[in-house]
Amino acid sequence: TVEDRCSGWAVDRAIRTALGNHPDSPIISLCGDTLGGEAKHLTEALAQGDTLAQDILIGVTRDLAFALSHVTHLFHPQVITLGGGLSLIGGPLRKSIEEQLPGFLMEIYGNGPQIKLAELGEDAVPVGALLL
């Protein structure tokens, strides 16, 4: 599912999987010995130029761009707004999706819809649920 591949938990899992293979990576040192919540360190690791963090981001956003291509083909939105905890990555998340999405779209859709980040960030989900 999208949740399995494109969520904060998916990023946590990817970081834990990489622990043994990349012990010198900045993201590994940022995470320390804590188990859970590793995704919150991705933004800082990206700012430090960590190639492992970049690879993890590209993997997650590739899967998310593929999922959003289906949304685009079915509903033709002009804008897709990303919320939830993963959106806290900010600009790097948005940019990576914008770069990868066109590769999954039929030519007629061009670069696809504009990708925006929800102003509510990780509070988007509970606020949306309360409004139902």
What is the role of each PLM region?
Residues 1-132:
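ATP-binding/phosphotransfer module of carbohydrate and carboxylate kinases, centering on a glycine-rich
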